[in-house]
């Protein structure tokens, strides 16, 4: 055999060895990528390629929760301490979404119930109002909440009424841009109150109704309270 032929054979063997080494390396790399993967459930499919370590348990839920809008959840109780409803305040895009849901049945009478934010974060049964007077349930929560600089009616804390069904269950979802989360939590905080009756929102047309003294339209009490009656459930916003 000539020296030239010998050199050619050696080169061919070297190339073959390198090719086999390259193929073996690829196979090893592919095996490392797909090891411990569950078998495919459909014929002709391959396992999903794994791209990293699994997230710690609960991480995805925690991240999803942290990405949600800021919110406050408040429990509303009757004067005897029985929970009547929950209220969730969510703040996003410059407005608040309030969701109120009754808990249990029989705590609220069927029909409409006025709902307001009150200006003092207190829920004391048989208490006097901030300016004194005869005691009553949750009177220490004061009147309807007004944000700083807002003095006209409807008050900043006026909300849509809650309608309770015949079975004693009710749900309300309403929105407002009349206050922010900081407004509700500032200073002495605020309270959300459900009343015994419906709120007329001071809608007493003067061309149809007059006060007992002959003055047309609603009086100051109707304008400020909506004639919604007793306070039957209360929750301090931000207390939970």
UniProtKB/Swiss-Prot annotation:
UniProt keyword list: Antioxidant, Cell membrane, Copper, Disulfide bond, Lipoprotein, Membrane, Metal-binding, Oxidoreductase, Palmitate, Signal, Zinc
Record Pfam families: Sod_Cu
Co-factor(s): Cu cation; Zn(2+)
Residue positions of covalent lipid attachment, annotated as N-palmitoyl cysteine: 33
Domain of life: Bacteria
Chain sites annotated for binding Cu cation: 116, 118, 195
GO cellular component, one term: plasma membrane
Signal peptide: 1-32
Cofactor note: Binds 1 copper ion per subunit. Binds 1 zinc ion per subunit.
Gene3D superfamilies (UniProt xref): Superoxide dismutase, copper/zinc binding domain (2.60.40.200)
EC number of the protein: 1.15.1.1
Lipidation feature positions (S-diacylglycerol cysteine): 33
Entry membrane topology: Lipid-anchor
Keyword Repeat applies: no
InterPro entries assigned to the protein according to its UniProt record, in alphabetical order: SOD-like_Cu/Zn_dom_sf, SOD_Cu/Zn_BS, SOD_Cu_Zn_dom
Catalytic activity: 2 superoxide + 2 H(+) = H2O2 + O2
Compartments it resides in: Cell membrane
SUPFAM superfamilies the record matches: Cu,Zn superoxide dismutase-like (SSF49329)
Record-stated family: Belongs to the Cu-Zn superoxide dismutase family.
Stated role: Destroys radicals which are normally produced within the cells and which are toxic to biological systems. May play a role in favoring mycobacterial survival in phagocytes.
Name by which UniProt lists this protein: Superoxide dismutase [Cu-Zn]
Organism: Mycobacterium leprae (strain TN)
Gene that specifies this protein: sodC
